[in-house]
Amino acid sequence: MTQAAEATLPPLNVPSYVKHARLIDWVQGVVALTKPARVVWCDGSQEEADRLCEQMVQAGTMRRLNPAKRPNSYLAWSDPSDVARVEDRTFICSQREEDAGPTNNWAAPAEMRNTLQGLFDGAMRGRTLYVVPFSMGPLGSPIAHIGVELSDSPYVAVNMRIMTRMGRAVWDVLGADGEFVPCVHSVGMPLAEGQADVAWPCNPVKYIVHYPETREIWSFGSGYGGNALLGKKCFALRIASTMGRDEGWLAEHMLILGVTTPKGRKFHVAAAFPSACGKTNFAMLIPPSGMDGWKVSTIGDDIAWIKPGQDGRLRAINPEAGYFGVAPGTSEKTNPNAMATLKANVIFTNVALTDDGDVWWEGMTDTPPAHLIDWQGKDWTPEIARETGRKAAHPNARFTAPASQCPSIDPEWENPQGVAIDAFIFGGRRSTTIPLVTEARDWVQGVYMAATMGSETTAAAVGQQGVVRRDPFAMLPFCGYNMADYFNHWLAVGQRLADAGATLPRIYCVNWFRKGPNGKFVWPGFGENMRVLKWMLGRLSGEAGGQEQVFGISPSYGDVDWTGLEFTPDQFQQVISVEAPAWREELALHGELFEQLAQGLPPALSRAKADIEHRLAAVQA
C-alpha cells in the first residue's frame, strides 16, 4: 500500500482493553480493503445504543415510537427490495463441492474471494465501520462461541446488542488469543464526498457467503435481518453446524422449552419446525384451561446449540439473547407472552405506524385501525386494503426484542452448562397423512422422521394435497454442509451417546395442521398443544399408554387428557389416523428425497424406510 493510500485510511482507535493482536490485524486488513471514513469499537452500553438510535432517527432510517405507548422503541422501514433472507444469493464455499451437497449453493472459494475482493474494495467509503464483538450463548459458557462482526450499518450494531451478548465483556472472554468467528458485512453503498445518504442503504447485488473450513462469513448488499445480523442464521446455524460436525455437537433450528408438571418434575424439550408452523407460539405456550398446575417456560424460540455434557446427556443453550420474530399473526390471542415481551425496548422493522405513534400489523387485532402509515410510508386504510389487497405490514415484518423481557422466560435460560434435553420434537404443516403425534421407536427411526419432514407450500383445497416442500430437520436453508452427511452426524451423535451408556432423548413427530372434510383445521392448536406435550412427557415417565402404528407409537383417545376441551373420538381419529394409500404416496416422496441425497445417504435410513414399507404392507394384508 502506498503512503498516500495509507493516509486516507482512518485511525483504528483500538481500545486499550482489546489485546487480541490477530484480531486487530484482521480489522486493519478489512479497513484497508473497505476504506471507511471512521472506525468505532462498540462497547454495548445503553449510552452507545441511544446515540446510534438517535443517529438513525436523524438519518431517517428509524423513527422513535410514542414513549407513552412503547418506551425506548423504534420503527425501521427497509428498502422494498431488501425485506427477507435471500436463499439464492447464499453460498457455502467449502473447499470441495461435495461437502456443500446438493441442497446448498456452492462456489469455489478462490473464485468467490476474488469476486468479494472486488465488491468490498472501497465498499464502506464515507461510512463508519463498527466493530461488533458478540458471544453466542452466555459469556464463558463451555457451549458458547464468540464472533466479531465488522459492519457499516448502525442498524446492525443496535440489533446485535439485543440479539447477542454484545460489548466490552466479550473482549475479557476472548483475551489475547481466543478463537472467534470473523464476520464482515457491508450494505454495499459507498458514499462519495458530499453525497447524501438514503434512509435504508443497500445494493441490488447481494452475496451471503460462508467459508466453512476457515469459519468466516462475508455478507454484501443487504441491511436486512438474517442477511446482515451475522450471528443469527449465518453463524449460529450454517457455520456452527459445521463446527458441530467437526467437534461432535449439534447446532439446530430449534426452540427450547421447560415443562414443569403439577408434581414439580421438570422436563426440557427441543423442537424444530419450518417457518409458518408456530415455533415462537409453541416456545411461549400457555397451558389451556383444564390443565391447571402445568407450567411452560421459554429458554429459546429459534436456535439451540446442543453438546454432550459430562454426565453424557445432551445439554442445550439458546445461543441468542433476543427474539427476531415475525410480527404478522402475533396477537394477544395467539401469543400473549410475545405481546408482553414487545412492550418496551424493541426495534420493529417493516410494520405499520399508527396515528398515535405506535405499531400495528395484520393479525394483531381483529379490527384494523381506521388509518395507518404502511411499511412503505404510504397512507393505508381498511378500504384501500379491500380494494388493492395491500398489506399494512410486510408479511416478513420483524420485531427485535430482549429475551429477558419474556414473562415465560425460564430461570435456567442463561445457565452456562445448558439444560438436559429429554425429548426432541419435529413437525411440519401437513393437511393430510402425518398424524397429530408419533413417538419414534428408536433414535434411527426418529432421525428418519426428522430427515423426511416437510410442509405444504400451498393451501390445500378440500380433498387435495398441497405441494410438499421437504425441509429435513427444518434445516434445509441453514445446514452448512452436505445434508446426507448431516443425517450421518445425527446418527453418529446418538450412537456415541448409546455406546457411553447415556439415556438418549426420545424423538417425536407432530402435525398440528390436519384438515377435516370441510377443509378446516381439526386440531385447535395453540395452548391446546399442551395436551400432546403432556402425553409425550407421560411416555418419558412411563405413565402414558400408546399404540403401535406403521410410523411409530401414537396415543389412543383415552391416552390424552381432554379436561376442559370438547374434542370427540371422531375428531381425534381425523388427526391421528394413518391411511395406507396416503402413506404409500408419502414413502414414494421420501424416496425422491433420498435419491437427491443418494451420495453419502446413511444406509440406516434406507433400512428405516424399508421397515415402514414392510409394516404398511402387513397392515394392508
UniProtKB/Swiss-Prot annotation:
Catalytic residues at 277
Give the record's cofactor note, including how many are bound: Binds 1 Mn(2+) ion per subunit.
The positions annotated for binding GTP are 276-281, 398, 429, 526-529
**Cofactor(s) essential for the protein:** Mn(2+)
Q: Which UniProt keywords apply?
A: Cytoplasm, Decarboxylase, Gluconeogenesis, GTP-binding, Lyase, Manganese, Metal-binding, Nucleotide-binding
Q: Which GO terms describe its biological process?
A: cellular response to glucose stimulus; gluconeogenesis; glycerol biosynthetic process from pyruvate; oxaloacetate metabolic process; propionate catabolic process; response to lipid; response to starvation
Positions annotated to bind substrate? 85, 224-226, 275, 396-398
State where the protein is found. Answer: Cytoplasm
Main EC class the enzyme belongs to: lyase
Q: Which residues bind Mn(2+)?
A: 233, 253, 302
Q: Which InterPro entries match?
A: PEP_carboxykin_GTP_CS, PEP_carboxykinase_C, PEP_carboxykinase_GTP, PEP_carboxykinase_GTP_C, PEP_carboxykinase_GTP_N, PEP_carboxykinase_N
* Domain of life of the native organism: Bacteria
- Any keyword Cell cycle? no
Q: Which GO terms describe its molecular function?
A: GTP binding; manganese ion binding; phosphoenolpyruvate carboxykinase (GTP) activity
Provide the reaction this enzyme catalyses.
Answer: oxaloacetate + GTP = phosphoenolpyruvate + GDP + CO2
- Does the record bear Metal-binding in its keywords? yes
Main subcellular localisation: cytoplasm
Q: Give an example GO cellular component term for this record.
A: cytosol
Please give the family membership noted in the entry.
Belongs to the phosphoenolpyruvate carboxykinase [GTP] family.
User: So what does this one do?
Assistant: Catalyzes the conversion of oxaloacetate (OAA) to phosphoenolpyruvate (PEP), the rate-limiting step in the metabolic pathway that produces glucose from lactate and other precursors derived from the citric acid cycle.
Q: Which NCBIfam families match?
A: PRK04210.1
Protein name as it appears in the record: Phosphoenolpyruvate carboxykinase [GTP]
Which source organism does the UniProt entry give? Bordetella avium (strain 197N)
